[in-house]
C-alpha cells in the first residue's frame, strides 16, 4: 500500500495518537498554554459534558445492573425496529421518590403555608487562588477553578475569584464586571456586579459599589452593544471613554481591556473590564493578555449561565409558592372583602418590596368612581390594622392613576413620575404631599373572569432596593408578577362579592320565609274556633267511623275533618306522650290544611286527610299499632297529613319537562322533597311546633322517619323497593326487629295508605276516580298547550273511555300485590285487600262492557257502510 494512501495513514494513526497523548501528559505546561490559546467555547462545553455522569439505579442490584447493561444495545435496537409502542414518559413516577422539600410547610406559629423559608445550605468554601506565575501550575489552578464552578452558584463570589486568577496572568490594576439588564420598556442597560477588583481586595469591597451604565455608551456600553472586545492603550484618547467615573473615584485610567461575556446562544450577558496593565509592554495589554482574558471569561460565561438558570428557577419557585399561598388564601377567606384584600396587599408589599399598595374597588352602580379603597404601607406589615382605609390617610392615596388605568384597561408603569409628561397633574406644582412622595409607580387593572370588565385596580408605589432602601423603577418582571397577582385579586374580589351576595340573598330568604310562615299559619280566629270545639267535645272514633277502612269524608265539613284529626292524635296517645298543647295542635292541623291548594282536584287536603284516616285505621283496626314505637306512629301520622303539601296538580315528569325551578333543587322525587320541605317549614313556624316536647335525639329520629315516609309516596321509589319486601314476605323471612326491614315496611305502609282510595266501596271509588281523572286530564291539557307534546293515555282527555281498563292495569301492576303482602303482615288489614279485589271486578266489568260497546259500534258502522 502506498505511503500517501488513506489506508496507510489510518493504520499508523493509533500509534501516533498514543505518542502525542503521552508527550502532552509529560509536558503539562505546553498542554495548558495550548488549551488556553486554542480552546473554543464548544471544546470547553464538551469538556464539561464528558464529566457529567448519569448513575443508573437498578433495583436488582449489581447483577441486575450488569445484565441490563449487557443487553441494552439489543433492547434499543429492538425498540427502534419495532412498531409504534408506548410513548416514553417525560417524567417517571420514581422521580418523585427522591427526597424533596415538603409542598406544604408550617411556619414558626404553626400556620400552614406553601411558602417555604429560605434554605440555608452549607457550601464548600472557595479555594483561595494561587498567584504564582509558574506556567506549570496553571493547569492545577484551572482545575481548582472548574471545581469551584461545579459546586457554587454565587455569581459575585465566583467572578471575583476568576478575576483574581486572571490577575495572575495579565497583571492589571483593577477589574470590573457588568451584567446586562432590562428595564420595564425592554431597554437594556448595564449594572456593575463587581467594581474595581484589585489585588488584595475583598469580595465585600468589590460588590458594595453599584454603578449603572447606559447601553451603547462609553467603553463598556459599546462592547456590550457590538459584542466585540476592545484593547485601548490610552483611554483619554478614545472618544467613547467617559471620564466622569475617574472624577468621582479619583482614579486615573490609562489602558483598558474590555471583553464581552456571552452565553451558549452567543448573546452578550455581561462585560468584563481590566484597567491599567501594571508591568511590561509599556503599560498596555498584549495579544496574549487578550487570549488569556478571553479564556477565563469563557468560564465567567458558564458561571453566569448556570447562575442565571439557578436564580430563575429560585424565582419561579418563589413565585409559584406565593401564588399557591394566594390561592389558598382565597379559598380560606371569602366572608370579608376587607380582610382578604388586606392579606393580599400584605403579600404583595412583602414579596415585591414596595412602599405602598392600594387596591381600588370599582363601584358597580357608578363605573366612574370607586366604591371602596384598601391602602397599606410597608410600615404597617407588622401592625396589620383592622381598618386599612382611614380618613386621616385619604390625602396619601392618589386616585388619578387608578382612574386612568380603569378607563384604558391597560397596565401603567412609570419609572419616574416627576419626569413623566403624559399626565397634567404631574407637571403642576400643587404642593400635594402624596404626589411628591411618588417616584416609581406600577398600576394594573383587576378584571373579571370574562376579561371585559374592570372590577378594580391595584396600584404599587415606590419599588425599594433590598439593601439600600433606595427607590428604583419597576421592571418587566414586576409587571408580569403583578399581572398574576391581580388574577388572584380578581378571584378573591369576585368570590367575596358572590359570598356577600349569597348572604344578602339568604337574609332576604329568611325574611321571605318569615313572611310566608306567617301567612302559611292558620288564622287566630279559626284556631280559636277549633280549639273551642275540641275543648267542648270531640266525638269518639267509633262515632266518627275513622277506624273503618270503608270511611268516607264526603259528608264532612273541613272543620269536622280537623276534629277527626284531633281524635286520631288523642286516641294514639300522641298528645299525652309528647306533651302537645291543644292550641298548638289545632293551629298546626289548620295550617297543614291551609297549605293544600284548593284548585287541585284530587291532591288536596281531603286526600291528605283520607290518607291519615287509613293510617289510623291500619294502626287501630289493622292491629299494626303494637308493632311500632310511639315515635314511628307520630312520624307516620304527621307524614300522612303532610305528604302532598303544596301539590300543584302535576307529577314529577311534568315538573322536569317544564323546567320548573323545583327541578333544579332535587335530582329525584322532586315533588316529594318539596312536600317534606313544606312540612318542615310548618313544623318550625311559631305556634305550630307540635314536636317541641321531644328531646333532640327524638326530634332528629322523628324528622328522619317523616322524610322517609313522605319520599316513599313517590311511586318510582315504591316500584324500585317493593321487590325486596315482597320477596321477604314470600319466603316468610320478614322480621320487624331488623331496622332495615322495619324501614321498608313503613315505606310500604305509607304507599298502601296513599293508594287506599282504590280499596273504598264502589260508589266512593268511582267518585274519587273521577277526581283523579279530572286532575290528570288538566295536566294533559297543559302538556299539549305549554309543552307541545302529546300526553300519555292516562293524562289524555281524548282517551277517557280507557279509564276502566287503565284502572284494572293500575290495580294489577301497583296495588293488588301490595295489599296482599300487607295482609300477610297483619291479617286485620284484609279489608284493604278485599276492597281492592272487589273494585278490580267492577272496573273489569266496565272495561269489558266498553269493549263490547266499541265492537258493536264498529260492527254497526261497518254494516251501514
UniProtKB/Swiss-Prot annotation:
Task: Describe how it is modified after translation.
Answer: Phosphorylation is regulated by binding of cGMP to the two allosteric sites. Phosphorylation by PRKG1 leads to its activation.
Cofactor: how bound:
Binds 1 Zn(2+) ion per subunit. Binds 2 divalent metal cations per subunit: site 1 preferentially binds zinc, while site 2 has a preference for magnesium. Tightly binds zinc.
Which residue ranges does the record assign to the PDEase domain?
A: 526-850
Q: What is its EC number?
A: 3.1.4.35
Which keywords does UniProt give here? Allosteric enzyme, cGMP, cGMP-binding, Cytoplasm, Hydrolase, Magnesium, Metal-binding, Nucleotide-binding, Phosphoprotein, Repeat, Zinc
The UniProt catalytic activity note for this protein reads: 3',5'-cyclic GMP + H2O = GMP + H(+)
Q: In which tissues is it expressed?
A: Isoform PDE5A1 and isoform PDE5A2 are highly expressed in the cerebellum, hippocampus, retina, lung, heart, spleen, and thoracic artery. Isoform PDE5A1, but not isoform PDE5A2, is also abundantly expressed in the pylorus.
Q: Where in the cell is it found?
A: Cytoplasm; Cytoplasm, Cytosol
Using the UniProt annotation, give all residue ranges assigned to the region (Disordered): 69-92
The main place the protein resides is cytoplasm
What are the Phosphoserine sites (modified residues) in this protein?
92
Q: Mind listing the GO molecular function terms for this protein?
A: 3',5'-cyclic-AMP phosphodiesterase activity; 3',5'-cyclic-GMP phosphodiesterase activity; cGMP binding; metal ion binding
Gene3D superfamilies documented for this protein = 3'5'-cyclic nucleotide phosphodiesterase, catalytic domain (1.10.1300.10), 3.30.450.40
Task: From the UniProt record, give the pathway where this protein acts.
Answer: Purine metabolism; 3',5'-cyclic GMP degradation; GMP from 3',5'-cyclic GMP: step 1/1
Q: Example GO biological process term?
A: cGMP catabolic process
What superkingdom heads the lineage? Eukaryota
Domain commentary: Composed of a C-terminal catalytic domain containing two putative divalent metal sites and an N-terminal regulatory domain which contains two homologous allosteric cGMP-binding regions, A and B.
The job of this chain, per UniProt, is described as: Plays a role in signal transduction by regulating the intracellular concentration of cyclic nucleotides. This phosphodiesterase catalyzes the specific hydrolysis of cGMP to 5'-GMP. Specifically regulates nitric-oxide-generated cGMP.
Q: What is this protein called?
A: cGMP-specific 3',5'-cyclic phosphodiesterase
Q: Gene encoding this chain?
A: PDE5A
Amino acid at each position: 500500500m502506498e505511503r500517501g494512501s488513506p489506508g496507510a495513514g489510518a493504520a499508523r494513526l493509533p500509534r501516533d495518537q498514543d505518542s502525542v497523548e503521552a508527550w502532552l501528559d509529560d509536558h503539562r505546561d505546553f498542554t495548558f498554554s495550548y488549551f488556553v490559546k486554542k480552546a473554543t467555547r464548544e471544546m470547553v462545553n464538551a469538556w464539561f459534558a464528558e464529566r457529567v455522569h448519569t448513575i443508573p439505579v437498578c433495583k436488582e442490584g449489581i447483577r441486575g445492573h450488569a445484565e441490563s447493561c449487557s443487553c441494552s444495545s439489543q433492547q434499543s435496537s429492538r425498540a427502534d425496529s419495532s412498531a409504534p409502542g408506548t410513548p416514553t414518559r417525560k417524567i417517571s413516577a420514581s422521580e418523585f421518590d427522591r427526597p424533596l422539600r415538603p409542598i406544604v410547610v408550617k411556619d414558626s406559629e404553626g400556620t400552614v403555608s406553601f411558602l417555604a423559608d429560605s434554605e440555608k445550605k452549607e457550601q464548600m468554601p472557595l479555594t483561595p487562588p494561587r498567584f504564582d506565575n509558574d506556567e506549570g501550575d496553571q493547569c492545577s489552578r484551572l482545575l481548582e477553578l472548574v471545581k469551584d464552578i461545579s459546586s457554587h452558584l454565587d455569581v459575585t463570589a465566583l467572578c471575583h475569584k476568576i478575576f483574581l486568577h486572571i490577575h495572575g496572568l495579565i497583571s492589571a490594576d483593577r477589574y470590573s464586571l457588568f451584567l446586562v439588564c432590562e428595564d420595564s420598556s425592554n431597554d437594556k442597560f448595564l449594572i456593575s456586579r463587581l467594581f474595581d477588583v484589585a489585588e488584595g481586595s475583598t469580595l465585600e469591597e468589590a460588590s458594595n459599589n453599584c454603578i449603572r451604565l447606559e447601553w451603547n455608551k462609553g467603553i463598556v456600553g459599546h462592547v456590550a452593544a457590538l459584542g466585540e472586545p476592545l484593547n485601548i492603550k490610552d483611554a483619554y484618547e478614545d472618544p467613547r471613554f467617559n471620564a466622569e467615573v475617574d472624577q468621582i473615584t479619583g482614579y486615573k485610567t490609562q489602558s483598558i481591556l474590555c471583553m464581552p461575556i456571552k452565553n451558549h446562544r452567543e448573546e452578550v450577558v455581561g462585560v468584563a473590564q481590566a484597567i491599567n496593565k501594571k508591568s511590561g509592554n509599556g503599560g498596555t495589554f498584549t495579544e496574549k493578555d487578550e487570549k488569556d482574558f478571553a479564556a477565563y471569561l469563557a468560564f465567567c460565561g458558564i458561571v453566569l449561565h448556570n447562575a442565571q438558570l439557578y436564580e430563575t428557577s429560585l424565582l419561579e419557585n418563589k413565585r409559584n409558592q406565593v401564588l399557591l399561598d394566594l390561592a389558598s388564601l382565597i379559598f380560606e377567606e371569602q366572608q370579608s372583602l376587607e380582610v382578604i384584600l388586606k392579606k393580599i396587599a400584605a403579600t404583595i408589599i412583602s414579596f415585591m418590596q414596595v412602599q405602598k399598595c392600594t387596591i381600588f374597588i370599582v363601584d358597580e352602580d357608578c363605573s366612574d368612581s370607586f366604591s371602596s379603597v384598601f391602602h397599606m404601607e410597608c410600615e404597617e406589615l407588622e401592625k396589620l390594622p383592622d381598618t386599612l382605609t382611614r380618613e386621616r390617610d385619604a390625602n396619601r392615596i392618589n386616585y388619578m392613576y387608578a382612574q386612568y388605568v380603569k378607563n384604558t384597561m391597560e397596565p401603567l408603569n412609570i419609572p419616574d413620575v416627576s419626569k413623566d409628561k403624559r399626565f397634567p397633574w404631574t407637571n403642576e406644582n400643587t404642593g400635594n404631599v402624596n404626589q411628591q412622595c411618588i417616584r416609581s409607580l406600577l398600576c394594573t387593572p383587576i378584571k373579571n373572569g370574562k376579561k371585559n370588565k374592570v372590577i378594580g385596580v391595584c396600584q404599587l408605589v415606590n419599588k425599594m432596593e433590598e439593601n439600600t432602601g433606595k427607590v428604583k423603577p419597576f421592571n418587566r418582571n414586576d409587571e408580569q408578577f403583578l399581572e398574576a397577582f391581580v388574577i388572584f385579586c380578581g378571584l378573591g374580589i369576585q368570590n367575596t362579592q358572590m359570598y356577600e351576595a349569597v348572604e344578602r340573598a339568604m337574609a332576604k330568604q329568611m325574611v321571605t320565609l318569615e313572611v310566608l310562615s306567617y301567612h302559611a299559619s292558620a288564622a287566630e280566629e279559626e284556631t280559636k274556633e277549633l280549639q273551642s270545639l275540641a275543648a267542648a267535645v270531640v266525638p269518639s272514633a267509633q262515632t266518627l267511623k275513622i277506624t273503618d277502612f270503608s270511611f268516607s269524608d264526603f259528608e264532612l265539613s273541613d272543620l269536622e275533618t280537623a276534629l277527626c284529626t284531633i281524635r286520631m292524635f288523642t286516641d294514639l296517645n300522641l298528645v299525652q306522650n309528647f306533651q302537645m298543647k291543644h292550641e298548638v295542635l289545632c293551629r298546626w292541623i289548620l295550617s297543614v290544611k291551609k297549605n293544600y291548594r284548593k284548585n287541585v282536584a284530587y291532591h288536596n287536603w281531603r286526600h291528605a286527610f283520607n290518607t291519615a284516616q287509613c293510617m289510623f285505621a291500619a294502626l287501630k283496626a289493622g292491629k299494626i299499632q303494637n308493632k311500632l314505637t310511639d315515635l314511628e306512629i307520630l312520624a307516620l301520622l304527621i307524614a300522612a297529613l303532610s305528604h302532598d303539601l303544596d301539590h300543584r296538580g302535576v307529577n314529577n315528569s311534568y315538573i322536569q319537562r317544564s323546567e320548573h325551578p323545583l327541578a333544579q333543587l332535587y335530582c329525584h322525587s322532586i315533588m316529594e322533597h318539596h312536600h317534606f320541605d313544606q312540612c318542615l317549614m310548618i313544623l318550625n313556624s311559631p305556634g305550630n311546633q307540635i314536636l317541641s316536647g321531644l328531646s333532640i335525639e327524638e326530634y332528629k329520629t322523628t324528622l328522619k322517619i317523616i322524610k322517609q315516609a313522605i319520599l316513599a309516596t313517590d311511586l318510582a321509589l315504591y316500584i324500585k323497593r317493593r321487590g325486596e319486601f315482597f320477596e321477604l314476605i314470600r319466603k316468610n323471612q320478614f322480621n320487624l326487629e331488623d331496622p332495615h326491614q322495619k324501614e321498608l315496611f313503613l315505606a310500604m305502609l305509607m304507599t298502601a295508605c296513599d293508594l287506599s282510595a282504590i280499596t273504598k266501596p264502589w260508589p266512593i271509588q268511582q267518585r274519587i276516580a273521577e277526581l283523579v281523572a279530572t286532575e290528570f286530564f288538566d295536566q294533559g291539557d297543559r302538556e299539549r298547550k305549554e309543552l307541545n307534546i302529546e300526553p300519555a293515555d292516562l293524562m289524555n282527555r281524548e282517551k277517557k273511555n280507557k279509564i276502566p281498563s287503565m284502572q284494572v292495569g293500575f290495580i294489577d301492576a301497583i296495588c293488588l300485590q301490595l295489599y296482599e303482602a300487607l295482609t300477610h303482615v297483619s291479617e286485620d288489614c284484609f279489608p284493604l285487600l278485599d276492597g281492592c279485589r272487589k273494585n278490580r271486578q267492577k272496573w273489569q266489568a266496565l272495561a269489558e262492557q266498553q269493549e263490547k260497546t266499541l265492537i258493536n259500534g264498529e260492527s254497526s258502522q261497518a254494516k251501514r257502510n
